UniProtKB/Swiss-Prot annotation:
The modification N6-acetyllysine is found at residue 319. Residues 247-262, 372-384, 538-621 have a biased composition (Basic and acidic residues). The keyword Acetylation applies. This is RNA-binding protein 12B. InterPro entries: ESRP (IPR050666), Nucleotide-bd_a/b_plait_sf (IPR012677), RBD_domain_sf (IPR035979), RBM12B_RRM2 (IPR034588), RBM12B_RRM3 (IPR034858), RRM4_RBM12B (IPR047188), RRM_dom (IPR000504). Residues 155-230, 284-360, 400-477 form the RRM domain. The gene is RBM12B.
Amino acid sequence: MAVVIRLLGLPFIAGPVDIRHFFTGLTIPDGGVHIIGGEIGEAFIIFATDEDARRAISRSGGFIKDSSVELFLSSKAEMQKTIEMKRTDRVGRGRPGSGTSGVGSLSNIIESVKEEASNSGYGSSINQDAGFHSNGTGHGNLRPRKTRPLKAENPYLFLRGLPYLVNEDDVRVFFSGLCVDGVIFLKHHDGRNNGDAIVKFASCVDASGGLKCHRSFMGSRFIEVMQGSEQQWIEFGGNAVKEGDVLRRSEEHSPPRGINDRHFRKRSHSKSPRRTRSRSPLGFYVHLKNLSLSIDERDLRNFFRGTDLTDEQIRFLYKDENRTRYAFVMFKTLKDYNTALSLHKTVLQYRPVHIDPISRKQMLKFIARYEKKRSGSPERDRPGHVSQKYSQEGNSGQKLCIYIRNFPFDVTKVEVQKFFADFLLAEDDIYLLYDDKGVGLGEALVKFKSEEQAMKAERLNRRRFLGTEVLLRLISEAQMQEFGVNFSLMSSEKMQARSQSRERGDHSQLFDSKDPPVYSVGAFENFKHHIEDLRQLDNFKHPQRDFRQPDRHPPEEFRHSSEDFRFPPEDFRHSPEDFRRPREEDFRRPSEEDFRRPWEEDFRRPPEDDFRHPREEDWRRPLGGLLQSTSGGHPQSISGGHPQSISGARPRSTSGDRPRSISGGRLRSISGAPERKISGTHQMKTSGALPMKTLGTLLMRTSGAPRRKILDALLMRTSGSSQRKTLGKLRRRTLDFLTILDLLVRILGARLMILEVTALL
């Protein structure tokens, strides 16, 4: 369902595009913007849904072209009635006044376009260098309505609906071919153009030609041209001219129709009164803010380059003999004045300068109040005191705050922190704005630690966040206090006083009576309504007693229950013995009997019977009797002699040298004896003990203490001193397994033993 919103405070320079941009993210159908205009800047906007209208209302107080606008809920009936009243007021008015001004409604615009399109034969040429466009019929050849006079009564015409930044040259181009003698622009109380002007022509003939330009375009706006009067010209600052002078000038200077008046301007310009005057004395004033403290008059003259500016037209403001960031500048011409306003937010010495128009009356009033404050009581100059509209230098002069608009109505402080993710913001530095009913406005105030951070944060202006285009504006603390927010007063002392008052129960002092009707999401505001309920502590006495009694009895009940649970642990203490004994009897002993003994019987003995005896029988005996037993012959067996391989060749080491023992000498047998026959005293005693072959096998299969025992047995069986010495070294060194393996392989010449030993490992 379509909903109509009424907008007030729309500046004259703003158009439908600016309104649609202000409501970015909301659905406005085609033809949904109706600008009424007038002194109050009225307009009606149609939104597609109720949700869009509700979110649009929350943006009330925002800025369109640096002008604050107010939004109200309206209806189609009110919109139609307002449009009809404005149209009737314009038609029934005999002569224009300085009162309300307006822009034609949509129905009037369509009617005018149709009427002018049907009279396309009256067109005339237009100066193409002007840069403006007409509606296809020309400026001076429109067929006038029956209700409008075709001939001017005097050389004065009243214009309505002019753009904000219009100047005299634009008006002369608008009346191309006519001799314009002077222009006076009407202004608001703040010094801005209100869209109205009075034009004085050289003659009534030129004024009659100007009436034909009614509802022609100046840029993108329709301009209403009506009959004026000499009284209005004088009232708004013009000088009266004698009638004879007017007739003489009209005869001399009125050019033929269609001829450009450029070569007449100098002569007519010299005889006309001053072309721009305001209600106040001569001059146009601007208010400069956020200036650098080191700036001087020369810097401002360079800043306003191209304007006629002297040091006498510049005035800086001081506080306690210290310069502030404010200044006033007076311009002599409207052109210089418009040039200065176009430099708004231009950076000067690393600071964006804010240039606002101001009237002479307001400037003098501000200076008088400021001078009074300087010479006034020290109470007004104490820290924290701010004037009603402007705050002087100090901390309030620095622009540390940013006013944020166009957030969703339910935005939170955490979301604001995410928007300023590049800046370290605490929740205390963020202030959310709410209406009287506690509904979010989608606006917030954020304070930064320094001006540099605030200026960097302002670069996020018009960045999309949460589906909307967020608008940012850098403001000072004084401007922030106009919202009713003062971060400087929210100090730790005040927070401590609030906490102490809350502990005392004096909840009436938690919030200052001077606090504005703006709600925050702070910690105190969340409990604002609950504090009143907490005052009635009598309602909570009985529940507290009921809860305290059960807290005392349960420990006694559990003390008795703990005694009952002491006996089960005694019963369970015997269980570890039951579990430990089976571990020793059932697991440890069977592991020795079942695993270790079969390992010796099944694995160690069978290889001795099945593998080693066949090797000796099958491989060594067929070699031609080279291998002998341990009782005689050449020591080709384990007891000594040159060890032969399976092929009968003499084995060599990896390097190609003769195989040597560990001690570095010639290769010896296990007993360490040199290569010779075992006879006489060198014959080993093997009676009543294990043979040397069995001891060698056990030596290969054991390590550590068992190996030392085997070496002791070999020492007992060895008679030679050198052999005993070698075995003693082996026993002391605890031979490496690989060394013993290499020694046994060279002595026994068995290759399969490597696989067997590897499997055992």
